[in-house]
Amino acid sequence: MSQTLAAVEGSLGSIGYGLAAIGPGVGVGIIFGNGTQAMARQPEAAGLIRANQILGFAFCEALALIGLVMPFVYGY
């Protein structure tokens, strides 16, 4: 009985992280989509826009990595 509960608990953790990864995935898509559109509208500001794009990407991916690490830290 306890083996079955452990298997279900592990599966729920994977599903939870999969759902949590949707947010950063959507965020990265929005960042690069809007950044590309902004560079097309103002090519002279491409360097500044690209720098802000990369910074936003790093913050979004940090959220995904935190979501991946937290179950290991708390022992779920």
UniProtKB/Swiss-Prot annotation:
SUPFAM superfamilies: F1F0 ATP synthase subunit C. GO terms for molecular function: lipid binding; proton-transporting ATP synthase activity, rotational mechanism. Keywords: ATP synthesis, Cell membrane, CF(0), Hydrogen ion transport, Ion transport, Lipid-binding, Membrane, Transmembrane, Transmembrane helix, Transport. The keyword Metal-binding does not apply. The record marks 61 as: Reversibly protonated during proton transport. The chain crosses the membrane at residues 12-32, 54-74. It is found in: Cell membrane. Its main location: membrane. InterPro entries: ATP_synth_csu_bac/chlpt, ATP_synth_F0_csu, ATP_synth_F0_csu_DDCD_BS, ATP_synth_F0_csu_sf, ATPase_proteolipid_c-like_dom, F/V-ATP_Csub_sf. It is a multi-pass membrane protein. F-type ATPases have 2 components, F(1) - the catalytic core - and F(0) - the membrane proton channel. F(1) has five subunits: alpha(3), beta(3), gamma(1), delta(1), epsilon(1). F(0) has three main subunits: a(1), b(2) and c(10-14). The alpha and beta chains form an alternating ring which encloses part of the gamma chain. F(1) is attached to F(0) by a central stalk formed by the gamma and epsilon chains, while a peripheral stalk is formed by the delta and b chains. This is ATP synthase subunit c. It comes from Streptomyces coelicolor (strain ATCC BAA-471 / A3(2) / M145). The gene is atpE.
